[in-house]
Structures are given as structure tokens and as C-alpha cells.
Amino acid sequence: MIKFYFTTFHMKFPARLFSTSGNRANFEENSSNEVQNQIKYLKDFKKENPKFNWESTTEPKHMILSNIGEYEKNDFNLKSLLNINEFNINVELLRQLFMKLDKNFTYALGVILRNVDSNTNISVDRHFLVNFNTDPVIILQQIYDRIIFLSEKYYLVPVDKLFIKLRKLNFKVKNPVFHPIAKEKTNIHTTIPKGKSKLSRAEFVPHTMDLKFYGVETKHDKEKNIRIFDNGKVILKVKIIKDGVYHLIDVISRDNRLLYQFEDVKHGDGLKRYWINDNMYYYYYDNTLVNVETPQKVGNIEPAKRDKTQDKKILAFDIETFQVPTGNGDSTMIAYACGFYDGKKSLTYYISDFISQREMLLACIKDMLKYDKHTVYCHNFSKFDINFIIKILVQEFVVEKIISKDLDILSIKISYKFEPKKKGGKAERHTITIADSCRLLPGSLDKLAKDHNIITKKGKFPYKFVNKDNLEYVGLLPDYEYYIDPKKGEMITLFEWAAMYTNKWSMRKETIIYLEKDIKALYQLMMEMSNNTYSTFRINITRVKTASALAFLVYRTIFLPNEVEEENETNSPNNILSLFDKKEEKKLTPKYFLPKLKGRLERAVRAAYFGGRNEIFIPIINNIFSFDFNSLYPTAMMMPMPVGIPVHTFCKNLNEIFGFVRAKIITPAINIPVLPCRVKVNGVQKLIFPIGEWTGWYFSEELKLAVEYGYKIEVLESYVFEKRDDPFKEYIEHFASIKDNTKGSKKQMAKLLLNTLYGRTGMNDSAAEIKMLTTNELDNIQLTNNVIHEFEVDDDKHYVRYDKKPCPVLCAQSEKNYELLSYLDGEKDDGFIINSTSIAAATASWSRILMYKHIINSAYTDTDSIFVEKPLDSAFIGEGCGKFKAEYNGQLIKRAIFISGKLYLLDFGGKLEIKCKGITKNKDNTTHNLDINDFEALYNGESRVLFQERWGRSLELGTVTVKYQKYNLISGYDKREKLYSLGKWVNTSPLCINENFEVISKALVSDVGESWYRKRIHYNK
């Protein structure tokens, strides 16, 4: 049994990490000003007092520490980080804690932040190795530094407690050594080799093809056209292929060893020298090194093979739950029924027939395991159902494999050994894979069933009527109010409800009927997808777990391979395979070299990978129109793409480069800037489009667009790729045509494959992964990798989420070879990576380029949508990729109020359309009774309080909870500077940044004038 030791610091500090891309509406449970003040104080204090002894001689006020035992907790009240003595209290608590540690062992120390009000925890994403004699001052500085770093990178809100969690390892490593926290870097710096670098070889070889500078000629073989020179340092053996145009040179030591080989080729008026050993090209002009090119070692995306037989081993599984109130309007979910369907019969389980929820779920899973090698689909499994069964799966079965993305388990493969039915018989081990169907077919089951014309429709059930006391209820039909969903409105009409009237309505019977409809509808949906995918592409959907992975597999199977003639192939005009069946099955070769990047190259290109544009230019405006770009990302994928083997170069001419460039940027005084940048605004990292001067990585074509609008670009280095116009054109055109010319499931499938391909190309395959590990395996992982989250599921079984890449600090502490581990990790990843960051970054860049000329005169933009005063020219309107469509049936928007990104109101002359991302809409498309008066108040700087239902989930506790949380809705737009006139916000101006990515000046114009303001504010009723 693993023993855990706890001590708790009671404090205010950041807890939850929220993504801030897109500048979502600011929903704050509490003001984060206190947090930012604490962080600023600590950073300023450390900067101003670099030699300050953190451990003050002042006697701490609270030093009492009880004996620490298994699962014992001790609370220590701290107010904030603003008082240095409170840091000393924490140091003393840690010191006394460390003194109680076993001297013969090393411990893994984790940090957990807790918010008491919302009863939520989050781990600081780094564990530390500590011993009996670890300096508590150093470790606490490391903890504070890490939390400060996270607070700068993410949006954080205050917490109440900070837990220190220790876990004993089974061995001892050397005394841990701590280093300053390494900040993430996006600027990858390189320079042209200078001096006596082994790469330049300047001391060995002259930078010319003129042989008179090569030294004393010692031999001339005219027959072989070879000349040998001695320059006093080395012997130069020159094979002249074409005099003065192409030479092949061996560099030989004086003891007759071959040192290097290089080729010299005349290059215009200069020289191109290729060092064969290092695979590097040096360019000289007038005896001066002007450029170095280095082809990169990269793999490529390989074609995938088609399946020979269809995998029809599919089950559909679901769990039914009800809510148990826990006070203050909150509740927790309890599973009371479950079941699965195999295409012929359904097996259902009801909690009244079992002694507990656990036994009911266990019985269902064991019965599913009788279907060996089946894939069990469960809709929204990764977000909901997994929480009820994860501990059962780990404790009762063997977990063979987990596929995860971020915090979610997408699928889990388990096995179980069934005892022989007859004496002397052989035991059988069966496996099943439980997967989330929602990741393959996003959307609600009800809507999907309608869109795909599934025979069995999702049922209607009074969810709110169920409670722990009426599970065997038989009586009158539940009141009509139970058939009204506050989010979706009426499930059935009042007439339909009246027609259902009965005094023998049975909770058990109706639950089972509803459950069976759900699992049958899901089974039919997945089988239809399986049949269509196999008959069309000869691909089994069970090979992949997400829609984007399926789209990429279709591309790699059908569109990427070269066409090779085969015998006895029959074409069918109704089958897409007829277009591509003539492919060699045994050895497929790709039409295009789609590079798989890793290491420094991947980091540089990923630094140039920016998301969509979401900005407010004019906050309040009358009489406008809304337009959406049809299939923006698929259209962008038909633009020229960077493929082939990338070459690192120091070429300064932007027009000669197609690829990714690190450049120094100087912007003009432009109101709608071209280039994006990640910058901390008010302590939070955001994607903005600033003016100013900075250095960063960008796609070359976006830099060329910037030059057209007055930007000054100084190229520092770049990765040049081959330019191809057609890697994805065939794929996009094919599915766009199906989407535009078909209906039903074919249309939905084509739309899915069209829109999800791009996302897979940019996935980060080097991120964290989730595994179930033994204690020894966990100990070994903690020696080399950052453990983000871990908890014990069962004896010697741990749920562990950790970084795939080894951590240099942990490797140094545990005396592991970081370089070797990194190399092995890179080699392992190369075979697994099936993405191409260069394609993703170029696609995102092309999408911004395509939209730029249309947003110049817009009031608001969000990735592929614009709001403009004048309708677009008819040449831009139409069906299909590359055209715009008028939103809201082309209606004139009488008034629009834009408060923040994805927070706005549109008034169509009394009829309102409200966008408020993160807050659920009511059935009438309003948001918690927000109206135009509320938006005008927000526009004027006031706030509005909302109460929102939030679902929380905990794998560790195996629970799903429902809470009503209070949110303070404010006008927190800060991606551009607000401009005022007569005290009213009427316009925005880009932020200005410097080389350190700091906002140094906020507005181009301080006041836009009274006449302009009146023109915009006047409401034309």
C-alpha cells in the first residue's frame, strides 16, 4: 500500500487554467487583481533584491506541525504572498516536514491548488524530487516560480489552499539539484558559422575554385584529371569534373587520413560548396561567406493501406443517470441503469437488481467482454461515462491500452480471462475497446440520428423526475413540466403528452425503453458510418478514434499514394475506389513528400502556427450585414503548400523564400495590422495583431502580404520548403462536391471529412499521455518525466498523466542521460507522428491571408466571419469553397453591440440574436434573460451577474457533479485599445509592442471626434 503524506498551506493563489485564445468573454468567479498584485510583488521583490536571504531571521508566527502520518492533513492559515514572513512560515513548515522523511529514500513532491468554494483541485504540472536534506527555501522558490510562470501563460483565478503532497519512491537518487525554471522559447536563434568553426573549415580550404590558391601542387594526373595540393596544413585532392565549374575535393591529413569531402560548383559569380560529411551548403561571393544551407533530416507521411475485410464487431453502450441534490442547488450524478446493443438484442441492467451502482456496471462490462475483440461505442464517453467506470476497469480488468488527448481518455482497451466452462478446458482471454463515438461523429445523438436518417430516433424522457426514492415508481404519467428541457425547450407538445396519459407509468419500464432507443440509435448510426466508410474507402472506422484521424486516414489511403497499374481492376462509376483502385497494395509510394517535423525544426514552425483572428474594430454600429467564408480552412489547403525536405538557410531575400522565416518586424502605423503575435496582455497570453517592432517566426507568404501593406521585414533565417499547389486539391474538391450535391448521411459524412482534415495536421503528438502504471513504473517515470497528474486507483495501480518528453532537470537530479533519452524519444516519435506542422501552420496562415482584405472595413471579425456596413460584391458571394454566404438570410442588422470576443448582440429590429460563448442559451435563443439593455450596460462599462449550470467531472473520485456558479460578465476586451469620444467607447486601435513582446503604447489615436461618434451611435429605428 502506498503511503501519502500531506501538509496544507491555506492561501489565495491561482488555480484553474483556462485557454485565452480568441479572447473569450471574461467570466470571473472572483477578481483576479489580488492574484496579479501578489505575482507582481513577488517578481518585483526578487528582481530588486537578488541577494536577499529568503529565510529571514524573523521567528515565524505559526510553526506548529503535528506528527505527519498516513493521510493526515494539517492546515496553516496564510493570508497572501505579499508578506515575506509568510514565505518564511512556509519554509519552516517544509523544513519540519523534510526532517521527518526517511533518510534512505527519495520522495516525489507534488503541488495541488484547491478552491474551497467550488471544491476543485488542480495539480501544478511538475513534480519535484526531494530528500531528507533538501533545502526548503530552494524548493519553495521552485514552486512559486512555477506557479508564477503558469499564471503568466494561462488565465488563473484565486484559490484558497495549496497542498504539498509527498510519495516515497522505492530507491534513493543523489541529492536533488534545482535550476531556474526554464521559460518556453519560441525564438530559435542561429547564426552563420564564424571563425574556426569545424563547419566552416576556413583554416583548411580557400573560398574559391581558383586552384592557384590551394597551395603547392605535388601531383597532376592528367588522365584522371586529378590534381593534388599541399597547403601546409592538409592535402587537397581535387578531381576536376569541369574546370572552374564543378570540382570534387578530398581533404586529407598529413598522415594520409581522409578528413572531409566537399563539392565546389560555380554559382553565378560566386561559389556553392557542399560539405558531404555534414550535408551543408556554403555560398561564397568575393571570397566571403554569404549563406549557409542545411537540408534537414525529416521523415514523411506514408500512405496507408486499405482494409481487406470490414470490421463489423461493434456494440453500443450507454449509462442512464439521475441527480442527487448536495445543497445550494448543486447535485451529483448517480448511475441507475445501463445497457448495450449488439445489432440483434439488447442487454439492460437496472440498479434495483443489484446491491450497488458498482455491481450493476461491473455486470454489464463483464457481459460486454463476452464479445471478444469488439469495439464498444459510447456517446460522450470521454467527458461523461468514463467517470463512472474508470475505477472498475482498472480494478477488475487488465488495461491494455489508453488513447488520450489532453485531459480526455478517448478509448480504453481492456482484457479479462474467463474461466473454462468445462473442467480441464482452456481459459479464454477476451478484449474489448470502449471508445467515444462523439469524437468520430461530433454532435448530440438526437441531431445526428435526424441528420443521418436513422430508423430509431432518440426517445423523450422526464430526466428531472427521477430520484433515489422513485426508482420503482408506478403511477400517473409525470407532469408536463418534466418534459420541458430548460435549454432545448419542449421535448414533446402538450397534445402529445396528453395522448400518453396513463395511470400505470413505470419508471423501470420507461427507463429501459428510453435506454434501448438510445443504444439502438447509436448502434445504427455507427454501423451506417462503418458501412459507408468501408464500401467507399475500404477503411474500418475502428482503426481511428477521432473524426480528424479518420479524415487523415482517408487522405493517406486514397489520395496520397501514387497510382500504379494493377491487373483485373474493374471500375465502377458509383464507387470512389474506381478512381483510385489502381494502386500497388504491397508497396505504396506517396505522390507528395509531406514532412514530419521534430526537434528544433518543429519548434520553429510551431512558433509560426497561429490561430484565427477574433477582433472588435467598432464596438457599436448600425445597419450592417454578416457574411461567412465557406469552408475557409479547406479553401486554404488548396493554396500552395510547403512540402519536401526543408532546408535551413540564411538567405536574406524574402522573395526567394517559400517556407518559414524568422524575421525582425517593423510595422507601419496601420489600423488593421497583418501579422499576429502572442503577447501577454494584463498578465494573460493572448493572440493579438499589434504594431511596433519585434522578432518572430512566420510563414513566408504572410510576410510578403505584410510587405505590401508597408511592413519592413529583415530576414534573419528561414526553413525553405518545396512549393506545391496540389497536395490536397483533389481531396478538397472531391468532398466539397459531395457536400454541395448530396443530402442526408452522404452530405454529413463529406462535410465531416472536409472540415476535419486540417486539424489533424497540426496536432502536437509530443504532448502528455495517460497510462495506468504500477508503483515501480511510476517511480521510474518520475525520475525522468514531468508528472502532471497522478492518483492511486487500486493497490499498485496508478492513473498517471505525464509529459512524453523527458525533463532535463529531473534527468540531472536522477543522473539519467537526458541526451540519450531525448534521442530515443525522438526516434520513437518519428515512427508514430502522423501530422505535419508545416502544413497546419501554412493552412492557418493562408486562411488569415484570404480573409485580410475583407476585414479591413469590418466592424468585427471571428476567423471566417465578418460584419460589414456594405454588402459584399456579388463576385464574392456563392456556393462552394472560396465564396462567402450571407448570414441570417441576408437580413439587415439594425444594430450591433460587440462587447468582447464571442460576446455580442445583434438587433434585427426587435428580434435579438445573442452570442455569449460559454453560457448556455435558453430555448428562445436568449442567454439567461440578457437583453439589449444589458448589452448597453456592458458597453458602458457596467457588469452583469449570471448563474450558469456547470458540470464537473473527476476521474479520481469517479463522479460527475452539477453546480450553479456565479459569473461576473464584464466588458474585458483588451486585444486592441479602446478609443473614446465624449466618454463613449466608439472605436479601437492596435496595441504597440517592443522586442520583449511588452505592450508599450496602446493607441494610435486618443480621440476620434464628436461627429464620428454621433454618426456611429445614432440608432436608425
Swiss-Prot record:
Q: Does the keyword Transferase apply?
A: yes
PROSITE patterns in the record: DNA_POLYMERASE_B
Report the Pfam families cross-referenced here: DNA_pol_B_2
| Gene Ontology cellular component list | mitochondrion
Gene Ontology MF terms: DNA binding; DNA-directed DNA polymerase activity; nucleotide binding
Which keywords accompany this UniProt record? DNA replication, DNA-binding, DNA-directed DNA polymerase, Mitochondrion, Nucleotidyltransferase, Plasmid, Transferase
Q: Which reaction does it catalyse?
A: DNA(n) + a 2'-deoxyribonucleoside 5'-triphosphate = DNA(n+1) + diphosphate
Q: InterPro entries recorded for this chain?
A: DNA-dir_DNA_pol_B, DNA-dir_DNA_pol_B_CS, DNA-dir_DNA_pol_B_mt/vir, DNA-dir_DNA_pol_B_mt_lin_plsmd, DNA/RNA_pol_sf, DNA_pol_palm_dom_sf, RNaseH-like_sf, RNaseH_sf
Enzyme Commission number(s): 2.7.7.7
Q: Give compartment(s).
A: Mitochondrion
Please name the GO terms of the biological process aspect recorded for this protein, alphabetically: DNA replication
Q: Which PANTHER family match?
A: DNA POLYMERASE (PTHR33568), DNA-DIRECTED DNA POLYMERASE (PTHR33568:SF3)
What family, per the record? Belongs to the DNA polymerase type-B family.
Additional information: This DNA polymerase requires a protein as a primer.
The protein's name is Probable DNA polymerase
Q: What is the protein's species of origin?
A: Neurospora crassa
